Amino acid sequence: MDIIIIDNITKSYRETSGERFVVFKNFSLAIKKGEFVAITGESGSGKTTLMNIIGCIDDIDDGKIIIDGTDVTSLDEDELAKFRNQKIGYIFQNHYLLRGFNVLENVLIPSIIKGYFFEKEYIKKAEELLKTLGIGEKLHREITQISGGEKQRVAIARALINSPEIIVADEPTGNLDPKNSEIIFNLFYDLVKELGKTCIVATHNLNLAKKADRIIDLSPQEVRIRELSENSTY
């Protein structure tokens, strides 16, 4: 079953010159429930724009986007914000963790936004996620006192705390060295697969992308399916 349907969309931005730069024109893509999809492509090819569109952060000029049966292009701002908070978890290259908060508190922020103020259920879930990601012993460490790789693990746990159906990850290991990048990506991949989440990851690292069920390669002039990994069941 397709959980994400991007139907014939067009997306453009207005440049400082006043002209419009078209990122996508008549672009369509379907992603199955539980699929792990990697988005690759050179800088400027539209990876981040596509992540923002799927993540309901950015709007489109034309076309339709259906996520888990809902036409999100028909929702107003409040409806879209509620839908996004319920259905989608985000991981960004710049993790945007909050200074002055410890590891556990940073993970719990999405649940607090939903109105669950440090409820035992969410605290336990956060502790389990952090333990699975290898930093369970640093729950109460201030966020500035952990390494870059550990911060990215916190960002992964934060994205999963509300049990979203879909994870959108834009260059989630882009700021890490190759060794830590591979370690964190593998932890992330295994956890997402174990939880049965649908995941879309933008990455410039083809070695990491090869773990995906499917790789979508974006180029300035066209979008094409680059390859289907051997482990794909789709």
Predicted segments with their positions:
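The feature captures the beta-strand-to-loop junction immediately N-terminal to the Walker
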Residues: 40-42
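Conserved ABC transporter NBD signature motif
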Residues: 63-71
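Short coil-to-helix segment of the ABC ATPase nucleotide-binding domain corresponding to the Q-loop/switch region
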Residues: 101-110
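Conserved ABC ATPase signature
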Residues: 142-146, 150-152
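A short, proline-enriched helix->beta-strand linker immediately N-terminal to the Walker B motif
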Residues: 161-165
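Catalytic Walker B motif of ABC-type/P-loop ATPase nucleotide-binding domains
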Residues: 167-170
